[in-house]
Amino acid sequence: MNARPITDADIEAVAAMAAEDEAALQGRPSRLGANDVRDWLARVDLAQDSWLYEEDGTLVAMSWFDFIDDLGFFAGIVAQGAKGRGLGSRIVATGDARARERGAARVQTFGLEQDTAAASLFERHGFAFVRRFFAMAIELEAPPVVPALPDAFTLETFRLEDARPYYEALDAAFQDHWEHHTVGFEQWWEAKQAVHDFDPTLWFLIRDGDEIAAVIRNDPDRNGGGYVGAIGVQRAWRGKGLGRALLLRTFAEFYSRGVPRVTLGVDAESPTGATKLYESVGMTTENAGVVYEKALA
């Protein structure tokens, strides 16, 4: 069996394999596409930390590894027709070894909640459940009404000159988020501009005077529709309806572009009550994913 790094030319095939696997697990068609795979691999050094497994020229599995601070993370997919042949164990062993090489104190991986075979595999290799995340979505049937804000607040579209204060507001809002890692403005901004379909006309913010109180960052095409990549309200401004206003502004923008479907991912145990907010604007849970962790120190 041949293993080699993933290249841009492989993205469509990997997306098709991932969609087939997800559909089999959740019992309905998957909306995963090439842009979702590009997001998974956005921070990955493909030459060093990605693996595409082929047998007689046929794609049978893929995996990748990422590292930040003291944390290693890997994930992978085995094609439906190649399960039960040890590829999952090979992916886990490769991710574990790569994390140790990088000096990680711990390593995490991820699987859909329905994937009991993956859960058993991870547990056999010393991983334990640590967190659950929900994938939520809304299918808009009419343009949403964006609520008026109190006089002190203004809702605006992002401008390039807003980049640094926008980042600072987002980073501050995410201090409550599980496993948040501050990467610094330059690294964050470079990464965002490098996204192949970077579209800051889909980013919005709310000001309170000269201060940015809340922000939302959206991507045009993920999981079969528009995607909320991040939304954050700084602590001092929570409970004022700012998150709701940003979501409805986002929905209205996507609807005006002919995109009625919008999705996002959320920590099921978010201390800010994010799940309730998303439900209040009409979003429902489509599936759940589970993060597993293993200590290496």
For the regions a language model picked out, list residue spans one by one.
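Short amphipathic alpha-helix that is part of the acyltransferase structural core
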Residues: 1-39, 148-181
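N-terminal charged segments
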Residues: 4-75, 96
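A conserved beta-strand-loop-helix scaffold within acyl/acetyltransferase catalytic domains
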Residues: 26-49, 63-70, 177-233
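Acyl-donor-binding surface of acyltransferase catalytic domains
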Residues: 66-73, 78-152, 290-294
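Active-site/acyl-donor-binding loops of N-acyltransferases
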Residues: 124-144, 248, 257-297
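Active-site proximal loops enriched in glycine and acidic residues that flank catalytic Cys/His/Asp
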Residues: 208, 216-222, 230-235, 251, ...
